[in-house]
C-alpha cells in the first residue's frame, strides 16, 4: 500500500491486477485480497480467476490433483480459459469449487466498481461522465453457464 501512495505522489494513476483462486485460496483469503483492493482504491482494477493454462505450473498442479480443466473431455475447451466467457472454467482450489471462485470474482468486480470510495475518487479524478460509464458497465451481469445449467466443476 505504501508503494501505491508513493507512485500516486509522483502524479501517476494506478492500475492494479488481482487473482482469486490460487490453489491455497479460501473465501477468507480471497476476501482479504478484495479488501486490499478496496483500501488501495486504484484508478483502475482487473480481477481475474486463476487459470491453469497449458504449460503453466498451475496446469501441472491441476493435472496432479485431477482437478477439472477446460480441455478435459465433457468440459468447454479453450473457451473455458476466457475470463468473461459464459463457459469460463477457472482453477478450483483446495477448499473451493471452480464455480465458487468464479462467483467470488464476479461479485468482487461489482463490489469494487460500485463502491462509494471508488466512484467518488473517479468523479474527482476523471469526471461525472466516467462515473456514468462505470455505472452503466456495472448494470450488466455476466452470464455464466453454471447459473443456468448443472455443471460438475
Annotate each predicted stretch with a short phrase.
Residues 2-6, 29-36, 104:
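A general structural detector for well-ordered alpha-helical segments in enzyme core domains, enriched
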Residues 4-29, 44, 48-54, 87-98:
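Conserved strand-turn element in the central/C-terminal portion of the radical SAM core barrel
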Residues 28, 32, 38, 109, ...:
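Low-complexity, compositionally biased segments
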Residues 57-153:
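Radical SAM enzyme core and accessory elements
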Amino acid at each position: 500500500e505504501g508503494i501505491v501512495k508513493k507512485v500516486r505522489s509522483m502524479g501517476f494513476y494506478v492500475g492494479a491486477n488481482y487473482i482469486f483462486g490460487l490453489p491455497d485460496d479460501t473465501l477468507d483469503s480471497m476476501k482479504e485480497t478484495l479488501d486490499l483492493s478496496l483500501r488501495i482504491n486504484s484508478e483502475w482494477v482487473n480481477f481475474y480467476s486463476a487459470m491453469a493454462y497449458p504449460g503453466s505450473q498451475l496446469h501441472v498442479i491441476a493435472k496432479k490433483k485431477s482437478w477439472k480443466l477446460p480441455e478435459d473431455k465433457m468440459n468447454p475447451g479453450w473457451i473455458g480459459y476466457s475470463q468473461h466467457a459464459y463457459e469460463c472454467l477457472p482453477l478450483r482450489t483446495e477448499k473451493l469449487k471452480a464455480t465458487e471462485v468464479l462467483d467470488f470474482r464476479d461479485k468482487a468486480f461489482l463490489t469494487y466498481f460500485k463502491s462509494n470510495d471508488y466512484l467518488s475518487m473517479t468523479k474527482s479524478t476523471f469526471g461525472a461522465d466516467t462515473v456514468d460509464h462505470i455505472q452503466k458497465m456495472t448494470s450488466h451481469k455476466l452470464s455464466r453457464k453454471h447459473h443456468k445449467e448443472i455443471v460438475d466443476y
